[in-house]
Amino acid sequence: PNAITIVRILMAPIFLWMLLADGGSDGALRWWAAVIFIVAIATDGIDGYLARKYEIVTDLGKLLDPIADKVLTGFAFIGLSILGELPWWITIVVLIREVGITVYRFIVVSDHVLAAAWMGKLKTVAQAVALSLALLPLWDLVGEWIFWVNGVTMTIAVVLTIASGIDYVVTEVRAARARRAAASPTRDA
């Protein structure tokens, strides 16, 4: 499973190059970029499933898996913003949250592994759906209403991104307080 995660990380720059190579037009490279993104993000569930099924869940996997998601989605947000298809403020808000949580994961890794929480997983699914819709050049096939659908899915993804970031912070503050309370000697009155 860790090998799958590493391949997902390595697919990210290939995806970004294909997305940007022809200026983001609706040609073959855009379609291939979208397919690579969708396959790479979809394998997120596969590596986790295999790790649990064969009982080979590792701390490295818990650390690398969310990083693979962040690299893939981060490249997609950046690429869409470079192409002018997504406002930069959305990309910046998402990247601040993603980089912040990732840096925190590395800071606390010697103390404990900050595994993905349910809201973080929901956020990743919402981002994957919104980004997949934004990456697929469907406007020629189904019409301009796809932009409205993508706006709704992107809004949901951004709200969940912010909410899950807040959830991680609140959870970690509570856990830190509990660890301090457990480590400090009790006082008898």
Residue ranges and their predicted role:
Residues 1-189:
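Alpha-helical transmembrane bundles and membrane-interface segments of multipass inner-membrane proteins
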